């Protein structure tokens, strides 16, 4: 991969105008780059910060071509862009990330097969094309198991836990919609993730291991550094993956740690990730900074310095009234509100990060402030 080193004033095109696109744009602008964004929602968060905004569907070939013509480099904030369209774009325009990661990882089955080929430690899985395949799953994996759709799904959507024969109907309903993947259920002690940036000359920069807690399948909070001894093992797993998949820019690998302290790769997000948002305040470079450095052909920092341990919490729609009531009395809360036009109870509307020398006490105090949060 040949990198074009961008200069001040050059333009970065971003496919996707959500909060990740917005935070990419903010990092790009402080480095002197211009930003043009494409998103079908005319009120998406990135519109408020982009120099230019194209309101168009992600599969609008003419609009994507316009984005390419106006940009010196193109990046993307999410993995659900059509791989076929991305292939065509890479033939005409400068897209250092390429299409392979998207092509492999937007399908849960090819993602699992890729991890298997890389030698990653993953839980046993089986493909499900139709309802009758559940018999094979029950015989080989046994109860309980998780059924996930091959395509789409985020924040727990598109997946069901099958505990026994009585709970299998929900899985059948999911399979009737599209092909799925079944995974053996894992008794999880801890969830962690590792955010990584790859740049020119195969430079690689690791962020600290992140400890995550999900509630109702949505990331609730992240603690950094993770209270785990698995950081080096997680890096080793990432190194296996990058030998198999082409990455440029920031991506995140999510892991499970079971109750016997075994580490398993869960999934890969080929772009900046929710669990890395703490890095904006807690590190000398954020995950968005390093992403922009990578796609614009600049050198990456050799190491990421944690300025202070941190607790990051997602802010959902139902949290905002409470936040507004208490925010004035908590200057230690670094609050980011994304600017989404519609507030929904379970929708990510922002996040906040607290820097601390006592993670345990800060975590308890934060939970007390948002008591009753599920």
Curated annotation (Swiss-Prot):
InterPro entries for this protein: ATP-grasp, ATP-grasp_carboxylate-amine, ATP_grasp_subdomain_1, PreATP-grasp_dom_sf, PurK, PurK_C, PurT/PurK_preATP-grasp, Rudment_hybrid_motif
Listed GO MF terms: 5-(carboxyamino)imidazole ribonucleotide synthase activity; ATP binding; metal ion binding; phosphoribosylaminoimidazole carboxylase activity
One annotated Gene Ontology cellular component of this protein: cytosol
Enzyme type, top EC level: ligase
Entry keyword annotation includes Ligase: yes
Residues bound to ATP: 108, 148, 153-159, 183-186, 191, 214, 266-267
Keywords: ATP-binding, Ligase, Nucleotide-binding, Purine biosynthesis
Keyword set includes Heme: no
Source taxon at top rank: Bacteria
Enzyme Commission no: 6.3.4.18
Chain ranges of the ATP-grasp domain: 112-296
Subunit annotation: Homodimer.
Biological role: Catalyzes the ATP-dependent conversion of 5-aminoimidazole ribonucleotide (AIR) and HCO(3)(-) to N5-carboxyaminoimidazole ribonucleotide (N5-CAIR).
Family the entry assigns: Belongs to the PurK/PurT family.
Matches recorded under HAMAP family: PurK (MF_01928)
Name of the protein described by the UniProt record: N5-carboxyaminoimidazole ribonucleotide synthase
Origin species: Staphylococcus haemolyticus (strain JCSC1435)
Gene this protein is translated from: purK
